[in-house]
Amino acid sequence: MAAGGAHAAMGTHNLLSGLGGPYLEVIAIDPSANAPDRARWFALDETPETADPHLTAWMLRVDDPVPSPETGPALGLARGDLSWRVTVREDGRMPFDGVGPALIAWDGAAPSLPTGAARLISVIAIHPDPTALGAFLDDLDLAAPVSVQAGESPRLLAAFDTPLGPRILTSDGRGIDVITERQAAMDLFHRTWRYLDRGDRVAEHDEAMIASAEASLWHWRRVGAATQWAIGEWQCSRVHAVLGDGERALAHAQRCLGIAEADRVDDFVPASAHEALSRAYAVLGDMEAAREERNLSYRLAVELDDEERDVIEHDLGTIPIPLG
């Protein structure tokens, strides 16, 4: 990790690692700094000195960190050429009992970090009132692969892909259970559709849509079965087709079909795989292949029940294949 620096106003210092856009920050009380005249951020004053490293917070970059009772006021901070505003509550605690984000806005261009070997997959926030937390994030127009779940005790988790395999950081050191991870996979699948259905998507929504689809697939690969793996590939294919990336759409569609042919999957999956292939070929401009795959999908859909057939036929009807 790269050296970050000191935060004189908070009496802390940090290390940083780039994650390809997001970054991971290791932060601690700076023993060489004067104690601040206020509570330190991230509830560090309440953390025992003997505590093991753990996930303590997350931040969202926004254009304007508007203060609220949950986030606290926005403080102006600076170090060297960098200046930023960040929400910090008077008690130093994070919003929503420690699982909601602080808000940060950089004055000028945000600093960039070299991309490290690890990649952030998703953030999972568990809270007794997920509706309130979800509404808070919606008001911020959240564009990130985040799963909000219900739970008696607030917990924060972050999933990473690393050269040494998957890693899950948590706020309580308990790891992730199968039920939580399956729910995350489903939440991220539905979050992807929310982005797909938006008529006002901008670039940051497109990036979040890709990240959410890939995160859903990543989690399903750990806790799902062949049908979930195939549909995860299918959704990734749809996302890239919508964004005009035919090559990546085709690669995911081919993996979807490969799973359908090699494993036991639900009856609708082969028809969905050929629908995805048809859409990818249409994006690539290969209309002959697109028609062939569309016809294969129609033939397979005939054997499905009415509900599944209607879904497949609706999807096939949205593929832009000219008459001929």
Which residues does each predicted region cover?
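Glyoxalase I/VOC metalloenzyme domain signal
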Residues: 1, 10-12, 18-180
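Residue signature of alpha-solenoid helical repeat architecture, marking inter-repeat boundaries
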Residues: 179-187, 207, 227, 268
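Residue register of alpha-helical TPR repeats
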Residues: 186-187, 231, 272, 311
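Amphipathic alpha-helical segments of tetratricopeptide repeats
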Residues: 193, 213-221, 254-262, 295-306
